[in-house]
């Protein structure tokens, strides 16, 4: 779930090495594995608090935007010789790209719509309309099981999922996708 370790191996690492890319990855605050416990405990005790939960994931988006901006600015002034061999940055700040897959594709819609620092990105397997996504997400299956154990029936679960969806309105890629540019 939204962890930087997803960029540390597998095909993306091989692709980066083959094409000469470097990867900067960060946990998606509010949407990563450590956040799942907070989400689960609130689902069981007070699902009505979920409309407030957009704040942490939105901070995660802002963190990603700040990292991108630092790639164009602060990181270029780094003096550590491991990062600046020959006193030059190890990357070309005019060639920054975004790649997000699954949750990274979904939340990446917000990042790509808001950033002025990246012209191109790949949104792999993205989605929009969080209430719809929650029903289809393999990661959310465990939460639905918790809901079934905590609420009386399908109607209650649907109401809780509706509340959940309203909490994501400010994060929904449907809100931001019109601002993606070519």
Where are these regions (language model features)?
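Cap/lid segment of the alpha/beta-hydrolase catalytic domain
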Residues: 1-85
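Short, glycine/acidic-rich beta->alpha junctions
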Residues: 3-8, 52, 100-104, 168-172, ...
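Generic recognition of stable, solvent-exposed alpha-helical segments in well-folded globular domains
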Residues: 6-11, 59-66, 101-110, 116, ...
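Generic recognition of flexible, low-complexity loop/linker segments
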Residues: 10-13, 55-56, 84-88, 106-112, ...
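Short, well-ordered loop/turn and helix-capping segments at boundaries between secondary-structure elements
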Residues: 18-22, 29, 70-73, 77, ...
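Active/binding-pocket-proximal capping segment
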Residues: 29-32, 39-43, 116-119, 124-131, ...
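Primarily recognizes the serine-hydrolase "nucleophile elbow" in alpha/beta-hydrolase
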Residues: 70, 76-136
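The feature captures the conserved acid-bearing segment of alpha/beta-hydrolase catalytic domains
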Residues: 126-182
